[in-house]
C-alpha cells in the first residue's frame, strides 16, 4: 500500500510539473524566402535560434518555423485563501503566499502549477 501511495505522489508531482503554460506563434512562410529572425507579439525582432525572457515572465525561443513561449511563473494551489494572499514579484517571476495580517509570515502551500 505504501508503494502505491508513493507512486501516486510521484505521479501527481510529475503531472503538476508538466502542466506548463505555453503557446506557439507560427511564422508566415513565403516560398523561396529564408527565415533569419522572429518577431514577437510586441513587435520586437530576435535572431534565429535565440532565446529570451519577456517582461511577462515567459521564456521564448526563435526557431525556423515558429516562436515558442512558456510561462516561468508557478501558481500556488491548496493554501488558505481566507487568511493568505498571493504576492507576485515580476523581477524574479515568482509568487509568494503570505498572511494577510502579517505579510512577513509565509503561508503553507500544498502544490504549485507551472
Curated annotation (Swiss-Prot):
Disulfide topology: 22-70, 38-62, 57-93, 60-69, 84-107
Domain of life assignment: Eukaryota
Database matches in InterPro entries: PSP94 (IPR008735)
Pfam families: PSP94 (PF05825)
Entry keywords, A to Z: Disulfide bond, Secreted, Signal
Signal peptide: 1-20
Transferase found in the keyword field: no
GO cellular component, one term: extracellular region
UniProt name for this protein: Beta-microseminoprotein E1
Species per Swiss-Prot/TrEMBL record: Saguinus oedipus
Amino acid at each position: 500500500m505504501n508503494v502505491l501511495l508513493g507512486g501516486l505522489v510521484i505521479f501527481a508531482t510529475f503531472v503538476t510539473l508538466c502542466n506548463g503554460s505555453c503557446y506557439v506563434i507560427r511564422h508566415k512562410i513565403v516560398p523561396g524566402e529564408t527565415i533569419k529572425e522572429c518577431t514577437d507579439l510586441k513587435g520586437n525582432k530576435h535572431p534565429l535560434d535565440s532565446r529570451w525572457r519577456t517582461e511577462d515572465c515567459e521564456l521564448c525561443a526563435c526557431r525556423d518555423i515558429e516562436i515558442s513561449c512558456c510561462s516561468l511563473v508557478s501558481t500556488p494551489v491548496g493554501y488558505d485563501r481566507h487568511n493568505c494572499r498571493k504576492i507576485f514579484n515580476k523581477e524574479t517571476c515568482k509568487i509568494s503566499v503570505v498572511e494577510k495580517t502579517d505579510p512577513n509570515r509565509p503561508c503553507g502551500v500544498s502544490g504549485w502549477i507551472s
